[in-house]
């Protein structure tokens, strides 16, 4: 497979030092061991067993890894010893763990400086060497890997390459002769398999980094030495402040949880590792469902309590059945209390991408969202279990301190490697367990598939009553809370810093909000009106507001474009205070020596500027009357900022309907204290995590109300526009009617006084008429701008709703398409199975008829044999009977040969060359086959 470079273009070189550099990605030695185990587990090898052991060869301590998988050819071995070649694919639902084509190189070179690989695949045998020592001795500038290939007759293939590679291997490896290499190939059990030997292990203080002495059936990481306190247990870097689980320093414990559903036996130093079905070995097991927005399908999460050690808890995160992160603490487990102690969560994150060493995930947005969701789900499980157990056993120990047993007992068959569920109470199991030992007769045969799991990926397996109770309590408490909050919100004084009003140029610009948001805030506060309360004394520069104007001017926090995800910015510097005078303040009963000042305020709403003029309003009294006048002036300055002369639009107080329409159509900005109080309300609301759904539903309802109200305003705007057009038309008609035209091409004159008298019924001055006409034009322009603003809000609202509905429809379409695909696949498989069953039925009927025929022939032969035996006694027919017996024996032998060939089609393991047709062996085999066929047909 050595690629030749294009002419004139150089290949990228790989320095031998990269072997060590590449291995440094494994900061923990067991992650390097896991890479070699993964290579045996992957579907292209599909090993049933792997043996890991420590041995000594030529005074070198070595680690050996031997599996009984499919083995490799010399070309495939070359790819394995090269970098980045990974052609692993899923086979029969078995998903490969390997992704990058780098696991063997990084793992083996992390454990030791030199590695040799022996492999055979039934047709050929190969030996390959990956050695840093060899490359240093020959001073190689590129990584070279000697490979020797043998055929099944132990003869070398490709003599030119193999001789040079053989010489290099014999000189720089632990095996000095060809016979020793072949002996290692013979050490591989069976016709296929692979054996890896690693030596020159990484050492620390003249000793290897592994402890082989403390447990003769385990490989452990030595305990850390502390000169002051003495020995202390080994801890991974990320667990320096936690209790380290045994899997951190024991290879046997780590291998037992390495795979979510183990399909391969691991024999460590001669003793089988008792692998765990992690998701089944917990207590109080419940399942929850995670629905990420970035994924079209749901993800199952399993929660339970650790039965062995409550101090080992957290999330077990798997990827393609392989453990990536163990005991990752999330949610309430991160707090400095006993919440979440003992709870273990299990999730298979196939939608995340693992890092280079398969010990962590890439820190992406998807990973962060997943960790957050896991924390919320774990909090729900913890609260539910806490409430449930305290309710059932109020005087008992805390749930984390109760002695627990796994909810179920599962064991793996040593023959077929299938997992079987056992009845409760079966703790003592033999060293080797087979399906035939199963008490359940339904799963007593290795041919029977495993017990199917619950495939419900839509609903959790438990009801979150604690969450619902909190939600109901908050719903009951909310009506009592909102009036109190609104009262504080409307009458709470806010101190303003005086430097911000030193110059008109330093005034903070007003905030522009969408009309839909402001109308929602106005309605929300109007729904919870409270009677006015006495305002406490304060040095605030703001004037008192009437209850109605305060409610109208209050502003809710900013909402996102979809009205779902709310964001509040507390430290906002671009807020100012604007008081909009819509109603005349009644004249106080007692006259005060206070200057009265008319106010004019500007409201900018989405690019539309609207002006209002209110009547004079007296400043409210505070505790000190001496400073009331100055306080009033400052309050006016704070409210109106700068007095800008502008066109005055006079409001007709007599037309109440028009005033109400204007008050509702124009959305008013809010005060600073209103926004601050809304933020406090939101913080109070956010204490309950479940309130998000209710708030979302409320926002959707408010959105519908906004849309309806907007349509109403639009209709009213159109109505007023039509009325104004009618008035304009009447004015034009009056002009045409009462205009005197001169025939001498002089200017046309209009009797304005007569025109006004005709329209209004009374005499009006021309100046007043012009002002009213200008006012009408301004009113038309304002209504047009309001109309355009409302149309803009409607477009935004419709776009938000369309986006929501579109995303939901897309998600439903994807799920429905997946269901239809699965249904089609199931129907195709069902048809295939039907056809196979029909063929088997036909074959069975044919075999049954043939067996019946053979039975009758055998009975006939037996009867003829008995008759001939009785006739032998007569001396007169001795020669004839002998000849007859010879002929019958020949017939019987030929019949047995035919029966044997037929049985070979039914029983493939039957070796006809070892069958003696002169005895009744074939008859016994035929009888057994007939009995089995009858049992099968009866079942």
From Swiss-Prot:
Position(s), cross-link Glycyl lysine isopeptide (Lys-Gly) (interchain with G-Cter in SUMO1): 597, 650-651, 740, 794
Zinc finger residue extent: CW-type: 404-454
UniProt xrefs under InterPro entries: HATPase_C_sf, MORC_ATPase, Morc_S5, Znf_CW
PROSITE patterns, A to Z: ZF_CW
Subunit description: Homodimer. The sumoylated form interacts with PML (via SUMO-interacting motif). Interacts with TP53. (Microbial infection) Interacts with influenza A virus PA and PB1 polymerase subunits during infection. Interacts (via CW domain) with influenza A protein NS1.
Impact reported for residue 431 to A: Strong decrease of binding to NS1
Keywords in alphabetical order: Chromosome, Coiled coil, Host-virus interaction, Immunity, Innate immunity, Isopeptide bond, Metal-binding, Nucleus, Phosphoprotein, RNA-binding, Ubl conjugation, Zinc, Zinc-finger
Biological role stated in the UniProt entry: Nuclear matrix protein which forms MORC3-NBs (nuclear bodies) via an ATP-dependent mechanism and plays a role in innate immunity by restricting different viruses through modulation of the IFN response. Mechanistically, possesses a primary antiviral function through a MORC3-regulated element that activates IFNB1, and this function is guarded by a secondary IFN-repressing function. Sumoylated MORC3-NBs associates with PML-NBs and recruits TP53 and SP100, thus regulating TP53 activity. Binds RNA in vitro. (Microbial infection) May be required for influenza A transcription during viral infection.
Modified residues (Phosphoserine): 503, 514, 540, 560, 765
Name of the featured protein: MORC family CW-type zinc finger protein 3
Keyword match Amino-acid biosynthesis: no
UniProt-reported outcome of changing residue 419 to A: Diffuse nuclear localization, possibly due to loss of DNA or nucleosome binding
Domain of life according to the entry: Eukaryota
Biological classification of the source: Eukaryota, Metazoa, Chordata, Craniata, Vertebrata
Domain notes: The CW-TYPE zinc finger mediates its binding to trimethylated histone H3K4me3.
Effect of residue 740 to R: Loss of sumoylation
Region feature (RNA binding): 500-591
Region (Nuclear matrix binding), start-end ranges: 326-353
PANTHER family: MORC FAMILY CW-TYPE ZINC FINGER PROTEIN 3, ZINC FINGER CW-TYPE COILED-COIL DOMAIN PROTEIN 3
Tissue distribution of the protein: Expressed in heart, placenta, skeletal muscle, brain, pancreas, lung, liver, but not kidney.
Coiled coil: 686-877
């Amino acid at each position: 497979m050595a690629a030749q470079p294009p002419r004139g273009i150089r290949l990228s070189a790989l320095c031998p030092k990269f072997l060590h550099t590449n291995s440094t990605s494994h900061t923990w030695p067991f992650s390097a061991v896991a890479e070699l185990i993964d290579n045996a587990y992957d579907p292209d090898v599909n090993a049933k067993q792997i043996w890991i052991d420590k041995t000594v060869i030529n005074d070198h301590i070595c680690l050996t890894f031997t599996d009984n998988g499919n083995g490799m050819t010399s070309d495939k071995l070359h790819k394995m010893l090269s970098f980045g070649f990974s052609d692993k694919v899923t086979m029969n639902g078995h998903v490969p763990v390997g992704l990058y084509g780098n696991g063997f190189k990084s793992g083996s070179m992390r454990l030791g400086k030199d590695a040799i690989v022996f492999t055979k695949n039934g047709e050929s045998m190969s030996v390959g060497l990956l050695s840093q020592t060899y490359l240093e001795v020959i001073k190689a500038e590129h990584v070279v890997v000697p490979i020797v290939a043998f055929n099944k007759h132990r003869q070398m293939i490709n003599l030119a390459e193999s001789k040079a590679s053989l010489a290099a291997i014999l000189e720089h490896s632990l095996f000095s002769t060809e016979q020793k290499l072949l002996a290692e190939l013979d050490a591989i059990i069976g016709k296929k398999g692979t054996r890896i030997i690693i030596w020159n292990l990484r050492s620390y203080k003249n000793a290897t980094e592994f402890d082989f002495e403390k447990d003769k059936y385990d490989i452990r990481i030595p305990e850390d030495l502390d000169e002051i306190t003495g020995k202390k247990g080994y801890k991974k870097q990320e667990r320096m402040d936690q209790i380290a689980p045994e899997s951190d320093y024991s290879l046997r414990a780590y291998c037992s949880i390495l795979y979510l559903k183990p399909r391969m036996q691991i024999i460590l130093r001669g003793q089988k590792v008792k692998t765990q079905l992690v998701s089944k070995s917990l207590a109080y097991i419940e399942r929850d469902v995670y629905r990420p927005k970035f994924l079209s399908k749901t993800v199952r999460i399993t929660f339970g309590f650790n039965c062995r050690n409550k101090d080992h808890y957290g999330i077990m995160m798997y990827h393609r059945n392989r453990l990536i992160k163990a005991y990752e603490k999330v949610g309430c487990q991160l707090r400095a209390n006993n919440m979440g102690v003992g709870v273990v969560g299990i999730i298979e994150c196939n939608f995340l991408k693992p890092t280079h060493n398969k010990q962590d995930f890439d820190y992406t947005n998807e990973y962060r969202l997943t960790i957050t969701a896991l924390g919320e789900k774990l909090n729900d499980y913890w609260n539910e279990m806490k409430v449930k157990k305290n309710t059932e056993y109020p005087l008992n120990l805390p749930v984390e301190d109760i002695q627990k047993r796994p909810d179920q007992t599962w064991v793996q068959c040593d023959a077929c490697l299938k997992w079987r569920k056992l009845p409760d109470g079966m703790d003592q199991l033999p060293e080797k367990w087979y399906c035939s030992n199963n008490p359940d007769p339904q799963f007593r045969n290795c041919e029977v598939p495993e017990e199917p799991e619950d495939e419900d990926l839509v609903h959790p397996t438990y009801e979150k009553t604690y969450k619902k109770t909190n939600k109901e309590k908050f719903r009951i408490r909310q009506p009592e809370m909102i009036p109190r909050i609104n009262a504080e919100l409307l009458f709470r004084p806010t101190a303003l810093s005086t430097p911000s009003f030193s110059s008109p140029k330093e005034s903070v610009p007003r905030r522009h909000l969408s009309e839909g948001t402001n109308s929602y805030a106005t309605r929300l506060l109007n729904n919870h009106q409270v009677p006015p309360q006495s305002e406490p004394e304060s040095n605030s520069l703001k004037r008192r507001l009437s209850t109605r104007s305060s409610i109208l001017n209050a502003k809710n926090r900013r909402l996102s474009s979809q009205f779902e995800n709310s964001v509040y910015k507390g430290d906002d510097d671009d807020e100012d205070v604007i008081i909009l005078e819509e109603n005349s303040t009644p004249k106080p009963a007692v006259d005060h020596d206070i200057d009265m000042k008319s106010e004019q305020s500007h409201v900018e709403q989405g690019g539309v500027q609207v002006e209002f003029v209110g009547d004079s309003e007296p400043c409210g009294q505070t505790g000190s009357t001496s400073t009331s006048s100055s306080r009033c002036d400052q309050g006016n300055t704070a409210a109106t900022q700068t007095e800008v002369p502008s066109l005055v639009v006079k409001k007709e107080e007599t037309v109440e309907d028009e005033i109400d329409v204007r008050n509702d159509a124009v959305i008013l900005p809010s005060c600073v204290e209103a926004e601050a109080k809304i933020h406090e309300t939101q913080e109070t609301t956010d204490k309950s995590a479940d309130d998000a759904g209710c708030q979302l539903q409320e926002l959707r309802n408010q959105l519908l109300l906004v849309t309806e109200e907007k349509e109403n305003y639009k209709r009213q705007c159109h109505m007023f526009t039509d009325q104004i057009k009618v008035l304009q038309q009447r004015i034009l008609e009056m002009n045409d009617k009462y205009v005197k035209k001169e025939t001498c091409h002089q200017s046309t004159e209009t009797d304005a006084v007569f025109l006004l008298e005709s329209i209004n019924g009374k005499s009006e001055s021309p100046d007043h008429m012009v002002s009213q006409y200008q006012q009408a034009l301004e009113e038309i322009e304002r209504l047009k701008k309001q109309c355009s603003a409302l149309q803009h809000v409607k477009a935004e609202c419709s776009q938000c709703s369309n986006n929501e509905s579109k995303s939901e429809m897309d998600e439903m379409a994807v799920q429905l398409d997946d269901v239809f695909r699965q249904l089609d696949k199931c129907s195709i498989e069902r048809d295939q199975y039907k056809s196979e069953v029909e063929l088997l039925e036909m074959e069975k009927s044919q075999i049954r008829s043939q067996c019946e025929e053979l039975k009758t022939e055998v009975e006939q032969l037996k009867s003829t044999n008995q008759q001939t035996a009785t006739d032998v006694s007569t001396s007169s027919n001795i020669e004839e009977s002998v000849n007859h017996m010879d002929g019958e024996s020949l017939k019987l032998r030929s019949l047995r040969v035919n029966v044997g060939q037929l049985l070979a089609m039914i029983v493939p393991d039957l070796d006809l060359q070892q069958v003696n047709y002169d005895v009744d062996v074939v008859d016994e085999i035929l009888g057994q086959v007939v009995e089995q066929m009858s049992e099968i047909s009866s079942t």
